[in-house]
Amino acid sequence: NPTGMVYTKAELEAIAEVCCRHNIYVIADEIYCNLVYDNNEFVSFASLGEDVKERTILVNGVSKSYAMTGWRIGYSASNPALAKVMANYLSHSTSAPSTISQHAAITALTGPQEDMQVMKQAFEQRRDHLVERMNKIEGVSCIKPEGAFYVMMNMKGFLGKTMYGKVIESAEDFAQLFLEKGLVATVPC
């Protein structure tokens, strides 16, 4: 997240083994769990065993899979002791989301899931189209993400080159020119 990489069960098990051996807790951001492509399998970190589950703080929400950004509905699952501490902190740091947002999230999570699958297919088609087009641009490359809806582009081939009278010295320069000349917004990193 947000590179779109999907860890295999074996990779997660290796991470889990280290975490259990050293008593490390993991915050597992599973917000993109329903947006996995190309027959990749999403594996929840907490599903890897009781020891792992005890050390996992799972966070998720409805903003990505259900296109409910702005509704501000997220949730967490953890062992009871951690959940109590988080609930105490939350009760003093923020107010509750609106009632309508809560009911909308319940409906999204418990209702028919067909629309989410249609949205996922559209995201996958857009990803394929974007990656194919990006990799045809000289000086640009990108890896096909296995999940989420971002594409991380490598534009190092443009560094030091002049475009539209401006020398591209950084990712920020490239992003600004891309926005001004191509009307495409990017986030340099």
Protein language model regions, located:
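PLP-dependent class I/II
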Residues: 1-189
